[in-house]
Amino acid sequence: MKENITVAMLAELVDGEVIGDGEVLVGNFVSLETAGEGDITFLVKAGDQDLLTSTKAGAVIVHRKVEVESPATLIKVDDAYLAAAKIHTFLLEDEFSPEGIHRSAFVGEGCQISSEVTIKALVSIGNRVVIGPRTRIESGVAIGDDVTIGEDCLLKANVTIADGSQLGNGVTIHSGTVIGSDGYGYATDKMGFHYKRPQVGTVRVDDNVEIGANSCVDRATYGLTWIKSGAKIDNLVQIAHNVVVGENSLIVSQVGISGSTSLGRNVVMGGKAAAVGHLQIGDGVMIAGGSGVLSNLSAGAVVGGIPARPIKQWRKSVVLTTKLPEMQKDIRALKKSVEELAGKN
């Protein structure tokens, strides 16, 4: 972790404007409420601006429109949330110091492993594995045969990378996740018996992808399951065989994507959303949490509900649903009035 960095240096990283003393030294990124001398923090909610007048922080990242005076040095930016992420990451970065391969790790035959790696205790590495420089593999990771892992990767404890999987550069995979497990494919005969279809494809994970804990990315039946560059996948996500997740897409916890569905660039799937198989979901689509996607979606669509439909239409249906008990009373009263009128005739 970096210490004693000037505010001016941090502002330069994010194209920020310094208001106050740019030579103030900071090194610890904390919340606005707890920040003290030597700390840097950020303000996102406009309603919290009053905290700026009393903060003890060394520096605060704020939006350019904020005009409140503060004892702290301010860094004014166009997007405080984004700037905070960049600065926090910079402060936490350490120069990679390779520790080599732990004596309890197992390494198979024909492997090409950079000398600039850290491979912790009880890691198992299969045959013909390639691992690039500055990659860190933590305890209990299992790597199958013919796997390729690029530069600057991080595999947390107990990750499994199955045979033939390909990881690009800068990939982070958190504990318990399985890459390359068999896809779910069976053929059923007339008697109802299920016969497993061989799953002989692979998984490709491109550069700068991050996958959370306890998620599964299944290998393709044939060809590739493909997670493209910059995609960010949360914990507890299921990605089935032959799925394609487009560049910079965001897949939130408990999402399930069925086989052979393809997502475009910058798609967002909210928590617990699901998509059936063999769909085409266009660039920039946003799918509300808990939705069920049953048909193709054009680029830029914003949808919600089951089945997923345009977001305004779904919201209207939700409002109407909450009014059903009241509407039922009105219908009963109306029915009674009609029956009374009919009886008089």
UniProtKB/Swiss-Prot annotation:
Quaternary structure per UniProt?
Answer: Homotrimer.
Q: Where is the active site?
A: H241 (proton acceptor)
Nucleotidyltransferase listed as a keyword: no
Specify the protein name.
Answer: UDP-3-O-acylglucosamine N-acyltransferase
What role does it play?
A: Catalyzes the N-acylation of UDP-3-O-acylglucosamine using 3-hydroxyacyl-ACP as the acyl donor. Is involved in the biosynthesis of lipid A, a phosphorylated glycolipid that anchors the lipopolysaccharide to the outer membrane of the cell.
Keyword set, alphabetical order: Acyltransferase, Lipid A biosynthesis, Lipid biosynthesis, Lipid metabolism, Repeat, Transferase
Q: What Pfam families is this protein classified in?
A: Hexapep (PF00132), LpxD (PF04613)
